[in-house]
């Protein structure tokens, strides 16, 4: 019994020290993540050896060359899905990751390859982006700078040099793609379901009106058709419709690498955002996007000449029908194609658009099989569906342009995109019957409250989970006070402010917190610890200083090295005599944070 009590006491002591993670226990990034390279005639293969207790982000693995644009779209080994409330679903790797970079064009001269990658320790500390350089000869072999043997071709090689220069800081939308909006084989089922539901939503817009008489003629063409035969004919018609969309999806997938390169340029991104706005306005009925009447009439005449009731004829009708309604559904289709283009995968692109077309075809199959009486009656709700797509397109436009717009303008735009539809629902809902009125009031109320809260928090420099999801973070203004203390991005300004505070009150220490946008534990600390009332009661937030090292500049790296950190988060108590506490690493709850502060103040 005494032994059991002793063991339990030791366990409690260990738990009490859990928040005091020792920085010496962490590996430097060059040991936590070791890239190894193999060069072939058709590209470069990279293998990362990852230490136990660490993981890497797929989306942060980027390859660039000098001269530029030698590499095509990379392909990755299968990773693990990690759901994060701040960054969404992420693909991560433990133990090992493999990446293949194909050559985008013939390579005949030596070039430099720079790999940028990033990972975290399971203990809660994230490393800044690391750059590793390789000098590669143009004949498909690795050019050694050390004592590497000449027979380096077709085997994994150690890097020639590593540095943490931060020359390639993690952009908000880097080449790895935003994993919250990523179509991949790992998330295939969820993505296909989303495309199917989007197609189902499109089917309830006025775009589908021209197809209704065509579907009716399919069944009429076979006078002896029962419901089973009508069902088969309707399905064949939808397959023809789907074929056209599938081909478009394949093209989008094949041109994905080119699309990715273009979307790295600011003017292209802003032009795409403007196009989304124009397409959204068409969904609001300000103008119509459609084929010229003469072209529409030609296609309709061609389809009417085909005899209904025959499988081949019905299939061709479906193909022609896609050309009739294509311009009408162009706005949401443009967004879908941009989404698919990130994959560079023709099969995935074709599957996605095929599923979208199937969703669009469900009501058409129902009409062909059972007749139009089984579908809801046309009315204002169909316009509501179009308006919903319009607001979604406007939100996409803002999301694309976010890196190139001022923070407070983006907050204002997102707020309007919630408040305007809320007001429309509440005003128009008054004219509806009981059930539609209840739905309109419920949705309108949620959007109104959510939009007001989102705007208020954003205007005051505070963040919510939605701000994090949209990658919206208040700009770090030197010395600006917030619920997280005084924020700095410039290290010189930070040191000057800390020195002033310590000279004014030498008997009171200050707290220094290292933060970065790409650090999950930093987000958790901001959302669940540093904003708690009990923390503000225990800690003078006027003496709480936060340095934002998101940009990972040489000055940021020097400060991290000065404090013995590989990356954020890390919190220190700094005293006027120059001494400082051991760092608080990783995420801890408010009570543990206060306990640590009281022990080190």
Curated annotation (Swiss-Prot):
State the CDD domains in the record: DsbDgamma
Q: In Gene Ontology terms, what is one molecular function of this protein?
A: protein-disulfide reductase [NAD(P)H] activity
Q: Which reaction does it catalyse?
A: [protein]-dithiol + NAD(+) = [protein]-disulfide + NADH + H(+); [protein]-dithiol + NADP(+) = [protein]-disulfide + NADPH + H(+)
Question: What's its EC?
Answer: 1.8.1.8
Entry keyword set: Cell inner membrane, Cell membrane, Cytochrome c-type biogenesis, Disulfide bond, Electron transport, Membrane, NAD, Oxidoreductase, Redox-active center, Signal, Transmembrane, Transmembrane helix, Transport
Compartment(s): Cell inner membrane
GO biological process terms, alphabetically, are: cell redox homeostasis; cytochrome complex assembly
Disulphide bonds annotated for this chain are: 120-126, 207-328, 519-522
Transmembrane parts of this sequence:
192-212, 243-263, 267-287, 311-331, 347-367, 381-401, 407-427, 439-459
Q: What does this protein do?
A: Required to facilitate the formation of correct disulfide bonds in some periplasmic proteins and for the assembly of the periplasmic c-type cytochromes. Acts by transferring electrons from cytoplasmic thioredoxin to the periplasm. This transfer involves a cascade of disulfide bond formation and reduction steps.
Q: Which residues form the Thioredoxin domain?
A: 467-601
- What GO cellular-component annotations does this UniProt entry give? plasma membrane
> Per UniProt, what is the membrane topology?
Multi-pass membrane protein
Topological domains on the Periplasmic side lie at 21-191, 264-266, 332-346, 402-406, 460-601
Q: Which family does it belong to?
A: Belongs to the thioredoxin family. DsbD subfamily.
User: Which portions of the sequence form the region Disordered?
Assistant: 137-176
Chief location bin: membrane
Whichever gene encodes this chain, its name is dsbD
Q: Which residues form the signal peptide?
A: 1-20
Segments on the Cytoplasmic side according to the record's topology features: 213-242, 288-310, 368-380, 428-438
Recorded protein name is: Thiol:disulfide interchange protein DsbD
């Amino acid at each position: 019994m005494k032994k059991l009590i002793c063991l339990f006491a030791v366990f409690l002591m260990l738990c009490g020290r859990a928040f005091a993670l020792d920085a010496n226990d962490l590996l430097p990034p060059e040991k936590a993540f070791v890239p190894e390279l193999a060069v072939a005639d058709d590209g470069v293969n990279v293998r990362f050896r990852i230490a136990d207790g660490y993981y890497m982000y797929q989306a942060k693995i980027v390859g660039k060359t000098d001269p530029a644009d030698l590499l095509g779209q990379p392909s990755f080994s299968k990773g693990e899905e990690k759901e994060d409330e701040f960054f969404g679903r992420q693909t991560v790797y433990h133990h090992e990751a493999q990446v293949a970079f194909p050559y985008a064009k013939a390579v005949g001269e030596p070039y430099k390859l720079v790999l940028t990658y990033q990972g975290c320790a399971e203990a809660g500390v994230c490393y800044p982006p690391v750059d590793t350089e390789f000098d590669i000869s143009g004949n498909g072999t690795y050019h050694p700078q050390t004592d590497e043997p000449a027979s380096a071709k077709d085997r994994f090689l150690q890097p020639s040099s590593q540095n943490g220069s931060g020359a390639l800081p993690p952009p908000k939308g880097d080449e790895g793609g935003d994993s919250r909006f990523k179509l991949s084989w790992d998330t295939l089922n969820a993505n296909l379901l989303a495309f199917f539901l989007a197609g189902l939503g499109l089917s309830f817009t006025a775009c589908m009106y021209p197809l209704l008489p065509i579907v009716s003629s399919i069944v009429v063409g076979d006078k002896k058709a029962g419901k089973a035969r009508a069902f088969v004919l309707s399905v064949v018609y939808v397959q023809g419709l789907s074929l056209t969309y599938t081909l478009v999806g394949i093209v989008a997938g094949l041109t994905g690498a080119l699309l990715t390169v273009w979307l790295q340029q600011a003017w292209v991104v802003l032009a795409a955002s403007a196009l989304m706005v124009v397409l959204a306005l068409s969904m609001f009925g300000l103008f119509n996007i459609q084929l010229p009447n003469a072209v529409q009439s030609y296609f309709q005449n061609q389809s009417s000449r085909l005899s209904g009731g025959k499988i081949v004829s019905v299939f061709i009708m479906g193909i022609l029908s896609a050309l009739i309604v294509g311009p009408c559904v162009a706005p949401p289709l443009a967004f879908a194609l941009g989404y698919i283009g990130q994959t560079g995968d023709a099969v995935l692109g074709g599957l996605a658009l095929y599923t979208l077309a199937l969703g669009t075809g469900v009501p058409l199959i129902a009409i062909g099989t059972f007749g139009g009486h089984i579908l809801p009656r046309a009315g204002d709700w169909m316009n509501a569906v179009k308006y919903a797509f319009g607001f979604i397109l406007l939100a996409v436009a803002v999301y694309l342009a976010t890196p190139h717009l001022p923070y407070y303008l983006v907050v204002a735009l997102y707020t309007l995109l919630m408040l305007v539809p809320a007001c429309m629902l509440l005003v128009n809902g008054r004219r509806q019957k009981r059930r539609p009125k209840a739905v309109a009031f419920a949705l309108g109320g949620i959007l109104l409250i959510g939009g007001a809260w989102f705007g208020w928090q954003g205007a005051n420099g505070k963040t919510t989970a939605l701000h994090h999801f949209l990658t919206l973070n208040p700009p770090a203004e030197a010395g600006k006070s917030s619920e997280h203390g005084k924020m700095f991005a410039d290290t010189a300004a930070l040191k000057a402010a800390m020195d002033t505070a310590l000279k004014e009150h030498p008997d009171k220490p200050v707290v220094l917190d290292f933060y970065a946008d790409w650090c999950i534990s930093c987000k958790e600390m901001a959302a669940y610890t540093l904003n708690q009332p009990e923390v503000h009661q225990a800690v003078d937030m006027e003496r709480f200083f936060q340095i934002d090292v998101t940009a990972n500049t040489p000055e940021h790296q020097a400060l991290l090295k000065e404090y013995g950190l590989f990356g954020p988060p890390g919190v220190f108590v700094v005293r006027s005599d120059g001494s400082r506490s051991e760092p608080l690493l990783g995420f801890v709850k408010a009570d543990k944070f206060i306990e640590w502060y009281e022990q080190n103040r």
